[in-house]
Amino acid sequence: YEPGYEYWVYTKDIKVPTYFKLTKIGTEKWNHKMGYWIRTGEFESDILIDRDFNLVDGYSSMKIAHIKGIEKVPVYFVD
């Protein structure tokens, strides 16, 4: 995988570190992110993962995908 290119991967293959799971997304931020997804069908924030498929950024987008039962999501790999 090359950094800077969009790839589609299964959400089940992305490993979400515990520190993301322990972080509460603020209500205002969550409502904004979910509203954006409902209006556009796209995530407002990119999902960034490393070469081992560990989530680096985009936890709110991953959470939306999980809640909505989305099986594959667009991601960008970072070094």
Segments and roles (model prediction):
Residues Y1-D79:
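Short, charged/polar connector segments at secondary-structure boundaries
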